Curated annotation (Swiss-Prot):
The keyword Electron transport does not apply. One of its GO terms (biological process) is L-arginine biosynthetic process. GO terms for cellular component: cytosol. It holds the Pfam family Lyase_1. The gene is argH. It is found in: Cytoplasm. Keywords: Amino-acid biosynthesis, Arginine biosynthesis, Cytoplasm, Lyase. This is Argininosuccinate lyase. It comes from Shewanella baltica (strain OS223). InterPro entries: Arg_succ_lyase_C (IPR029419), Argininosuccinate_lyase (IPR009049), Fumarase/histidase_N (IPR024083), Fumarate_lyase_CS (IPR020557), Fumarate_lyase_fam (IPR000362), Fumarate_lyase_N (IPR022761), L-Aspartase-like (IPR008948). GO terms for molecular function: argininosuccinate lyase activity. It catalyses: 2-(N(omega)-L-arginino)succinate = fumarate + L-arginine. HAMAP family: Arg_succ_lyase (MF_00006).
Length: 455
């Protein structure tokens, strides 16, 4: 049953119905549509549109419908309804007759779908927050297990300075904490109720919209009916927050793919999250991580899609906004499974400490320490930087690490070098000198882990 047939004399074409109907997408708003309708029944009862008995009967029928559909979700799509609102109203009328036709009094699908979508975003957002927090906890546990596992740190994908795997983990802990904060902020901004805004000008019935918002667990009602029915900022923000978080997940996946490669071999991944080759029997591919990296693009695409859809819409509601859900639903589904998969990857990850340490000892990662040593002897840093560059060139030519130069050889580059240079060139010294807030010294890493666990 269409909710708008009275104005029309001709039949809708089958092609237009296929093009226009949104039930194959918005069926996911069923529970929110029923919950909103129950609250609306109370609201119209409060202004005398229906009696207390009628309100009770409507609410019972809606709750019965909720139970029925939860038991057999296929009922929705089998109905052939235009959208989820049409399905709920038709099913309600089938249960209570003409009484069901009273429920939509004073309400528009415009404020109805805006409310449904905000309720859905609140529910799914809370679940995503829990997933982010689980990933955060898994990463923090890994940081604690491997806090002192030495590995090379990179810039430009070139070995730069030694760090620890715990320090690497804590870098992503920081990123996911920002994701948690961003998502919580977005949900706070979305915590307002559009119901009662009507099609665009507000409902004609003087109901208490504060009470209506409270009944649906919103913090407050929206304050402008035009904005209420045309606002999709919460969709944009959720897609944006997901995109930033997926960027973090993708960067972490890329790091781990490299660390797991035969060229690095710093880590081993569990069989749970890897697959093999149909041709090459020796292969163990990091497919979980590659899929996280790959799914990032589709999340970005949905963000661009909703921004482009909304960018030129006049106030208030336009049918273009029906396109807000498919991308959003895909974003939430993709983000959720990537968060779960990332946590699973981390739970079974093992660090190959000897390989990671060996790589940190190579590549002249202690060059900065030699420069700092020269500075401590009174040489200006820029000059020290140049001198150490010359030492590195000579070391590469001889294919030896810096610490294997004899003192006499080092003195040919700078006469101020003495025997006390060698303790400064060890991996342990490189790490220990970074004993500053945010640094990679082991005490700093332990303090950072303890502080985050205490929150």
């Amino acid at each position: 049953m269409a909710l708008w047939g009275g104005r029309f004399q001709g039949e809708t074409s089958a092609l237009f119905k296929l093009f226009n109907d949104s039930l194959p997408v918005d069926y996911r708003l069923f529970e929110q549509d029923v919950i909103g309708s129950i609250a609306w029944a109370d609201a119209i009862a409060s202004v005398g549109i229906i009696s207390a008995t009628e309100c009770r009967d409507l609410k019972k029928a809606l709750n019965d419908l909720l139970v029925e559909v939860n038991g057999d979700p296929a009922i929705i799509l089998a109905s052939g309804a235009e959208d989820i609102h049409s399905f709920v109203e038709s099913a309600l009328i089938a249960k209570v007759g003409d009484l069901g036709k009273k429920l939509h009094t004073g309400r528009s699908r415009n404020d109805q779908v805006a409310t449904d979508l905000k309720l859905w975003c609140q529910s799914e957002g809370a679940a995503l927050l829990a997933r982010l927090q689980s990933l955060h906890a898994e990463l923090l546990a890994l940081a604690e297990r491997e806090f002192d596992a030495v590995m090379p740190g990179y810039t430009h994908l070139q070995r730069a300075q030694p760090v620890t795997f715990g320090h690497w983990c804590l870098a992503y802990v920081e990123m996911y904490e920002r994701d948690i904060s961003r998502l919580a902020d977005a949900l706070t901004r979305a915590n307002t109720c559009p119901l009662g805004s009507g099609a665009l000008a507000g409902t004609a019935y003087k109901m208490d919209r504060h009470a209506l918002a409270a009944a649906l667990n919103f913090a407050a009602p929206t304050l402008n009916s035009l904005d209420s029915v045309s606002d999709r900022d919460h969709v944009v923000e959720l897609c944006s927050t997901a995109s930033i978080s997926m960027m973090h997940l993708s960067r972490m996946a890329e790091d781990l793919i490299f660390f797991n490669s035969g060229e690095a071999n710093f880590i081993s991944l569990s069989d749970e999250v890897t697959s093999g080759s149909s041709l090459m029997p020796q292969k163990k591919n990091p497919d979980a991580l590659e899929l996280i990296r790959g799914k990032t693009g589709r999340v970005y695409g949905s963000l661009v899609g909703i921004l482009t859809t909304m960018k030129a819409l006049p106030l208030a509601y336009n049918k273009d906004m029906q396109e807000d859900k498919e991308g959003l639903f895909d974003v939430v589904d993709s983000w959720a499974i990537c968060l779960d998969m990332a946590a699973l990857v981390l739970s079974g990850l093992k660090v190959n400490r000897p390989n990671a340490l060996l790589a940190a000892q190579q590549g002249y990662a202690n060059s900065t320490e030699l420069a700092d040593y020269l500075v401590s002897k009174g040489m200006p840093f820029r000059e020290a930087h140049h001198v150490v560059g010359e030492v590195v060139v000579a070391a590469i030519a001889k294919q030896i690490p810096l610490e294997e130069f004899s003192l006499a050889e080092l003195k040919t580059f700078a006469a101020i070098i003495e025997d006390d240079v060698y303790p400064n060139l060890t991996i342990e010294a490189c790490l220990a000198k970074r004993d500053v807030l945010g640094g990679t010294a082991l005490p700093q890493i332990q303090q950072a882990i303890a502080a985050k666990k205490a929150r």
